[in-house]
């Protein structure tokens, strides 16, 4: 099922560890920094963070991240190049396109602090499999060349991640609502 912000908090990658470290550091400075001081006051900073799913952009080339198989597939098809996907066809992860990503940042940052129930928020749009990506890309790029050859090490990392995220808190607290679903992301 969909996971919330308090689940999957024991990452198996340095990337995940660093993301959580930054969240904890932000929470510390926002609530606890300098609390032994006579002049202690909570709220030194107004810390807010978003946990993004895999991001897809038609303009920004992917840089080899583990969720980049989807945008790599798209960019290879647009360039008429063969793409070998490194995850299993049924691998399912959450994604969103860059427009919704940017909109989520703007919405969270412009929301008054007293409207927020937490500091860390999940966002997302759709959760689909690698074969779903291939199929929709083939719909728009009839001559695309996409094959699958699983990289077991990368697959094991992906297998430790959630297939979908619950972003109800973002919807409730700051009216996050993705404009793009899987189908209209590719039009």
Which functions belong to the PLM regions below?
Residues 20, 43, 55-71, 98-99, ...:
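Glycine/proline-rich active-site loop of Rossmann-fold NAD(P)-dependent oxidoreductases
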Residues 10-48, 77-79:
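Active-site Tyr-X1-5-Lys
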Residues 2-8, 14, 53-55, 92, ...:
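Active-site pre-Tyr helix/loop in NAD(P)-dependent dehydrogenases
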Residues 8, 42, 49-64, 72-96:
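A conserved pocket-lining segment of Rossmann-fold NAD(P)-dependent short-chain dehydrogenase/reductase
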Residues 81, 86-89, 94-187:
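C-terminal substrate-binding subdomain of Rossmann-fold SDR/epimerase-dehydratase oxidoreductases
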Residues 4-7, 11-23, 63-71, 94-95:
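Short-chain dehydrogenase/reductase
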Residues 29, 73, 137-141:
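Short amphipathic helix/loop within the catalytic HATPase_c
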């Amino acid at each position: 099922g969909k996971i919330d912000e308090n689940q999957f908090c024991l990452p198996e990658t340095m990337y995940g560890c660093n993301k959580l470290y930054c969240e904890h550091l932000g929470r510390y400075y926002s609530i606890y920094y300098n609390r032994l001081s006579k002049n202690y006051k909570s709220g030194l900073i107004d810390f807010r963070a978003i946990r993004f799913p895999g991001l897809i952009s038609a303009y920004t080339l992917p840089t080899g991240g583990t969720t980049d198989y989807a945008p790599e597939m798209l960019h290879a098809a647009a360039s008429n190049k063969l793409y070998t996907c490194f995850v299993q066809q049924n691998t399912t992860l959450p994604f969103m396109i860059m427009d919704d990503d940017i909109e989520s940042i703007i919405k969270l940052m412009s929301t008054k602090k007293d409207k927020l129930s937490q500091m860390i928020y999940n966002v997302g749009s759709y959760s689909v499999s690698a074969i779903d990506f291939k199929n929709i890309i083939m719909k728009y790029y009839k001559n695309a060349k996409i094959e699958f050859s699983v990289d077991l090490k990368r697959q094991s990392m992906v297998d430790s991640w959630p297939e979908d995220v619950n972003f109800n808190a973002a919807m409730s607290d700051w009216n996050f609502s993705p404009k793009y679903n899987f189908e209209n992301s590719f039009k």
